Amino acid sequence: MAKKKVFVSGCYDLLHSGHIEFFRQAAEYGDLYVGIGSDATYLEYKHRKPMFPEEERLFMVKAVRYVKEAYINAGSGTLDFLPTLDIVHPDILVVNSDGGSEAK
């Protein structure tokens, strides 16, 4: 039986232990796929440039042992990950409550 595909999304700028723990917990449900907010979405959402450019954030997230694959999200705004969902076709979408807003 194939493992379920699990999807999470975020900016992951200044990747830290809280992100790693989130990945670990999400990966308990199956193979973990991660969407990363683009530089443009980061600027739109946080009103400043990220500390690390999208390609560097992608590299760091892919290096995390719990992550099967990672992508730079091609959409914009809070739901910037929708085009990535069309690529991954996850069985499970995991959303955390950390750093959230009413829109989240």
Indicate residue ranges for each PLM-predicted region.
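Nucleotidyltransferase catalytic core that binds NTPs
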Residues: M1-K104
